Regions:
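Sec-exported extracytoplasmic/periplasmic mature domains
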Residues: 25-30, 38-45, 65-73
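Short beta-strand edge/turn micro-motifs at domain boundaries
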Residues: 114-141
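Short beta-strand segments enriched in hydrophobic/aromatic residues
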Residues: 40, 97, 101-105, 119, ...
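Short, low-complexity N-terminal intrinsically disordered segments enriched in polar/charged residues
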Residues: 1-34, 38
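A short gly/proline-enriched turn/hairpin at secondary-structure junctions
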Residues: 7-10, 43-55, 70
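Hydrophobic pocket/interface hotspot
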Residues: 24, 35-37, 44, 60, ...
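Surface-exposed, charged secondary-structure patches
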Residues: 64-109
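Acidic helix-start/capping segments at beta-turn-to-alpha-helix junctions
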Residues: 39, 47, 51-56, 79-88
Length: 141
C-alpha cells in the first residue's frame, strides 16, 4: 500500500533472482564471506526478527564472523520462493523475492534447534538492497 492507503499493484516477478538467493544461502553454509559480500549492495540493510538492524556490508560481515565462530553452527535450507514486483510510493517499480528458509543451529545447551524464517528480499539490479527477516520456532514433535 502507498502512504495514502491506496493499493499498489503486485505483479509476478523475475525468477532470475531466485538463483541469486540460492547461491547467497549456499555461500552462508560454506562460510564464504567474500561471496556473501559481493551479492549485497554497499548500503544494504537487514531487519532481524528480534528488532535488530544491521546496516552496511562491513557490519554484516563482522556479524557473520562472530556467528560463524560461535558454537551455534548455523545452516540454512531454502524451502520455497515467490518473486514479485510492485510499485513503491512515487510509482517506481521495486523487485522483491519472498522466501521460506529453515535455519538449524545449536542452542546454548548444545541442542539442535530449527527455526522457520521468511525473508523478504529487495533487489536493485542483481544486488540485495534490503532483507526483512521473520521467524518462528519449528513445531516440537
Amino acid at each position: 500500500y502507498s502512504d495514502d492507503g491506496t493499493a499498489n499493484k503486485l505483479l509476478a516477478g523475475n525468477t532470475d533472482k531466485q538463483q541469486i538467493w540460492v547461491d547467497y544461502i549456499q555461500a552462508h553454509n560454506d562460510r564464504d564471506l567474500d561471496g556473501i559480500a559481493t551479492v549485497k549492495a554497499d548500503d544494504w540493510e537487514g531487519y532481524l526478527p528480534g528488532g535488530g538492524v544491521i546496516k552496511g556490508n562491513t557490519a554484516y560481515i563482522e556479524f557473520l564472523k562472530d556467528w560463524f565462530a560461535s558454537s551455534q553452527n548455523p545452516k540454512w535450507k531454502v524451502m520455497w520462493m515467490i518473486a514479485n514486483d510492485g510499485a513503491a510510493n512515487g510509482g517506481a517499480t521495486e523487485t522483491w523475492l519472498t522466501t521460506g528458509n529453515d535455519i538449524t543451529f545449536n542452542d546454548a545447551d548444545g541442542n539442535q534447534v530449527t527455526e522457520h524464517h521468511v525473508h523478504d528480499i529487495q533487489f536493485v539490479g542483481n544486488k540485495i538492497k534490503r532483507i526483512n527477516v521473520y521467524s518462528r520456532l519449528s513445531q516440537k514433535e
